[in-house]
Amino acid sequence: MTEQTPTPQLPADENSLIAERRAKLGALRGQGIAYPNDFVRTHFAGDLQAEFAEAETWTAEALEAADRSVKLAGRLMAKRVMGKASFAQIQDESGRVQLFLQGNVLGDAYTAFKGWDVGDIVAVEGGLTRTKTGELSVKASALRLLTKSLRPLPDKWHGLSDVEQRYRQRYVDLIVTPEAREVFIKRSKIIRAIRAWLDARRFLEVETPMMHYIPGGATAKPFTTHHNALDLDLYLRVAPELYLKRLVVGGLERVYEINRNFRNEGVSTRHNPEFTMLELYEAYATYHEIMDLTEQVIRDTAQGVLGTTQVSWDGADIDLAPAFRRWRMDEAVRHHNPEISAADCTDRAALLRHCERLKIKVKPSYGWGKLLLEIFEATVEHTLVQPTFITDHPVEVSPLARASDTEPGYTDRFELFINGKELANGFSELNDPEDQAARFQAQVQAKDGGDDEAMHYDADYIRALEYGMAPTGGLGIGIDRLVMLLTGSTSIRDVLLFPYMRPEA
């Protein structure tokens, strides 16, 4: 027996409305016209509104003289029956348009219209006119019902007031909440703009496996699955990094992928177990050039999609036009914690005392690098409102980044923070196979010590590095968080069409 999603209990009045609509559908079935599929539209509502926006030019007389015949289809969002004439509004993907309906023109179709419900999907054919109030309207010469809606839409004045219902029933949210629809249209434009930006700079888009033999590319807990035919445990990828860098070894010097990652971790306003990442690699680039690239692609995407580089996000006004600040992690920690000296930043015992003073919980396996990161996350991260690159992370928490030539224990790595949220992570890639093998081994020891997010040892990746990887810079940008920034959304669920939710009871 297959599991089924439980049907939510409905209020009695809603059940009665559904029963009425089912009866209407039954009548349509009896007439053999329940779900017709032979209508071809010629126009969209939004296009007509844009083309004939000038009311002074396109008067009712001018529109009727133009004799433009249009065929539209959409969802019935409002109706006002007034005896021999009525008005209605339909909505398609582009917007809304008013319909002017006359009984003496439509005949039986007008009679049928009186029994239709808001939410039904209809088709209309006719010419254009403008009402006395100046509203562009389709003067219907033919009208048909294409799809009977069995469930009533939410009240037009209150919409979907239950946020959880908006996420669970995104299909309803998109119908009744124009702002939600606009977020997802912008999301598509943002991703398209990023692709165009990278393609114009000779980056090659690639696809790498979604199921891995060995989880790697990020410190995160993976989802596991099983391949029955091979009798093999596999992992949904936490990041595509190691596969993309194998391609750099193979001579594809500029590669990128925009795709899903999966991490078996907590759910919050910033985290969803399944999320979209841009990850790219460029041979012969350092983390300085990758920071330049990150700054420019975000700025250009904002300008291209929004027409501005100034955005408001979660109560903060963000300006993406000025150069993003670049700040070493240890310097940022010392700035916000004057009690911590430069020497303390690499002294495990000193950092343990500071963590205890700051009431930061730590594990016995943490070295000074992990402790420094914990202090940064607790005391600095939330203060970074304007775009800031936090650079030079400790080796301990950067197992794939190139070690600094001048600062022992640190790496050539950055993370980008805006309004206290991490949006990007990048570094000069570690291309020394022996150093990488040692770092993998340290991660294995950390995993044995209880760190379930530590990486596994990937022998094939070490073999790839042994063939030689050019000096390379890499970058990962969280697309979901970038969309949050550019749409002013405060929860990651607002920018995911179908965020993960607990099953309904």
Swiss-Prot record:
Pfam families: tRNA-synt_2, tRNA_anti-codon. It comes from the Bacteria. Its cofactor is Mg(2+). Keywords: Aminoacyl-tRNA synthetase, ATP-binding, Cytoplasm, Ligase, Magnesium, Metal-binding, Nucleotide-binding, Protein biosynthesis. It is found in: Cytoplasm. One of its GO terms (molecular function) is ATP binding. Homodimer. NCBIfam families: lysS_bact, PRK00484.1. This is Lysine--tRNA ligase. The gene is lysS.
